[in-house]
Amino acid sequence: VFYLKKIYLIRHCESTGQEPKANLTNEGLKQAQELADFLKSKNIEYIVSSPFERAIKSIEPLADYNNLDINIDDRLIEKKLCNKNLNDWMDKLKISFEDLTICYDGGESSNQAMNRGVQVIHELIKLENNNIAVVTHGALLILILKYFDRNIGFSEWKRLLNPDVYLLEFKEDGNKLILKLFMK
């Protein structure tokens, strides 16, 4: 079976927090090196990342190893659930995976977040590069996968690790394959 494109969707490594400038923890820095070691054999030719520090730092070791630039795309930032801290944020997030149109105060709906993430994927498919790394955040990563497989949702989000890697493969005939990759 001939696959036209392989897109590695990557959730960032362990970070010190959720804010855009949050850096990786010491464990996260170690994970970034392990991620690079894991991806070295995948012939990554192009890297695109969320502008958040934790995403960029997660892929830097691979970018250095492959001598690649890290292209920044603001559309890969995390889904904004709402504009304030909620005690029941996990319940609200779960609901947002079921009702993709629901939008909490100052946040964005899952449909809005999904659409901006999927726009990036559709643009990447048109590139000449065949093996592409996309570094993003948990909820957005799952929403991108959900676009291609409606059965994916909250339970997959809950099982995400830092880092985590999913492979999206696109065939010439338009068929797609989603695989969760295990680094260990």
Tell me the role of every PLM-derived stretch.
Residues P51-F52, R75, V134-A139:
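Short, well-ordered beta-to-alpha junction loops that form the rim of enzyme active sites
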Residues V1-Y3:
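Short, Lys/Arg-enriched N-terminal segments with co-localized hydrophobic residues
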Residues I7, E128-A139:
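Generic beta-sheet signal
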Residues S15, L140-L141:
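Short active-site segment of divalent metal-dependent hydrolases/proteases
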Residues N23, D64-V118:
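Phosphate-handling substructures
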Residues K5-N71, E108-N111:
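Active-site-proximal alpha-helix that buttresses catalytic centers in soluble enzyme cores
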Residues S41-N43, L124-N130:
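Glycine-rich phosphate-binding loop signature in dinucleotide/nucleotide-binding domains
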Residues N151-L179:
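Domain-level recognition of soluble alpha/beta enzyme cores
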